């Protein structure tokens, strides 16, 4: 259900390093650890888990077209996300584009102020974002 799926997702995105056999063989996390429901309501329509996760891992950007684009493409990565999936992804895409990601304060959700259980650095994030946008 949603709780079990989201608990696995949270553990996966917070994991530092490769998702090797040892990581994948770990027991499933308890959804209650994250304040998520433990029962399976049978619903599989969650936008993240039911729609995006099945298709996102198979998507590969057209890097040639992106490099040729007239717009500036800026990748960002949170300094506290080092080694995590989102940060590794930002660096991998940036490398293919021949650029370097901008490092934002905090982690993957650095723009949040804790309202969803992920305290970030919204003021620091905003300052860095303003710097990036000023370079346009």
Model-derived features with residue positions:
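Catalytic active-site module of serine/aspartate enzymes centered on a nucleophile-bearing elbow/loop
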Residues: 88-91, 97-136
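Alpha/beta-hydrolase
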Residues: 1-92, 96-100
């Amino acid at each position: 259900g949603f709780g079990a799926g989201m608990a696995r997702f949270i553990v996966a995105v917070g994991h530092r390093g490769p998702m090797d056999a040892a990581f994948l063989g770990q027991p499933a996390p308890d959804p209650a650890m994250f304040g998520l429901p433990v029962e399976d309501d049978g619903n599989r329509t969650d936008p993240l888990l039911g729609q995006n996760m099945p298709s996102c891992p198979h998507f590969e950007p057209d890097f040639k077209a992106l490099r040729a684009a007239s717009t500036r493409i800026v990748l960002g990565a949170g300094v506290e996300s080092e080694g995590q999936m989102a940060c590794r992804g930002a660096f991998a895409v940036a490398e293919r584009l021949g650029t370097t990601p901008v490092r934002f304060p905090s982690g993957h959700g650095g723009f949040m102020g804790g309202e969803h259980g992920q305290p970030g650095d919204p003021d620091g994030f905003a300052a860095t974002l303003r710097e990036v946008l000023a370079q346009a």
